[in-house]
Amino acid sequence: MLTDGSYFHLHLVSDSTGETLITVSRAVAAQYANVSPVEHVYPLVRSQKQLDRVLQEIEESPGIVLFTLLESELVNRLEAKCQQINSPSLSIIGPVMQLFEAYLGASTTGRVGAQHTLNAEYFKRIDALNYSMMHDDGQHVEGLEEADVVLVGVSRTSKTPTSIYLANRGIRTANVPLVAGIPIPHQLETLKKPLVVSLHASPDRLIQVRQNRLLSLGAGAGNDSYIDRQAVTDEVLLARKLSAKYGWSLLDVTRRSIEETAAAIMKLLADRQRQRMSE
């Protein structure tokens, strides 16, 4: 058993980019805050020679081995070696593929990296990313009607990172800051197509994040309106009033990660689309 503060070797072996392995393993490793994985990522492992080099490194630094390999000979060799050196191994996609095969009554194509084919979904993500970068932080508001989602909120409510995250899911996302004393763009008042989501956070949380931001910029944490409690509270209240006035969806991001915020927005978007289809 590992003790607090220790580390372990985590070997990620893939015949493609390794993105699936990295995402899954980091999500699981995050649940064990007292130990740290040392990641060894081996992408594009598609031959016996390439696998030999991987097996040598695993033998030199034994640990958990996760893999996404479709070639059965490579899988058998990897599993045999792991068993020999007592390193636990697991295919991340194997059980999922077996479930699909049992339900669909069809075997897989065995096509390596099929999920990375340049299909319509890929180009949809690229289009969404381009759109979101062009419409970040209130830029080009004349194009807001072309968005799937428009995020609004006061400073430091994670509008930009949430926009990029959603864009990576193929969702065209614009974001517009709500600033005290500055009227909102008139385009926001008449939007029909996009889902407008107003991101909110508690004044305490906003002050904390803004102070950290100022310190990172070397600006110090002076008592200006950016972090003044009353001023920040007024900003939050103004944002809520605007949301109520225009019927924007409210989402409290005080204790949400970017991923959780994006997931909540995607649910709102899906619910809205289902409602429109039923009308």
Swiss-Prot record:
Its EC number is 2.7.11.32, 2.7.4.27. It comes from the Bacteria. Keywords: Kinase, Nucleotide-binding, Serine/threonine-protein kinase, Transferase. One of its GO terms (molecular function) is phosphotransferase activity, phosphate group as acceptor. The keyword Membrane does not apply. Transmembrane segments: none annotated. It catalyses: N(tele)-phospho-L-histidyl/L-threonyl-[pyruvate, phosphate dikinase] + ADP = N(tele)-phospho-L-histidyl/O-phospho-L-threonyl-[pyruvate, phosphate dikinase] + AMP + H(+); N(tele)-phospho-L-histidyl/O-phospho-L-threonyl-[pyruvate, phosphate dikinase] + phosphate + H(+) = N(tele)-phospho-L-histidyl/L-threonyl-[pyruvate, phosphate dikinase] + diphosphate. ADP binds at G153, V154, S155, R156, T157, S158, K159, T160. The keyword Ligase does not apply. Pfam families: Kinase-PPPase (PF03618). Bifunctional serine/threonine kinase and phosphorylase involved in the regulation of the pyruvate, phosphate dikinase (PPDK) by catalyzing its phosphorylation/dephosphorylation. Belongs to the pyruvate, phosphate/water dikinase regulatory protein family. PDRP subfamily. This is Putative pyruvate, phosphate dikinase regulatory protein.
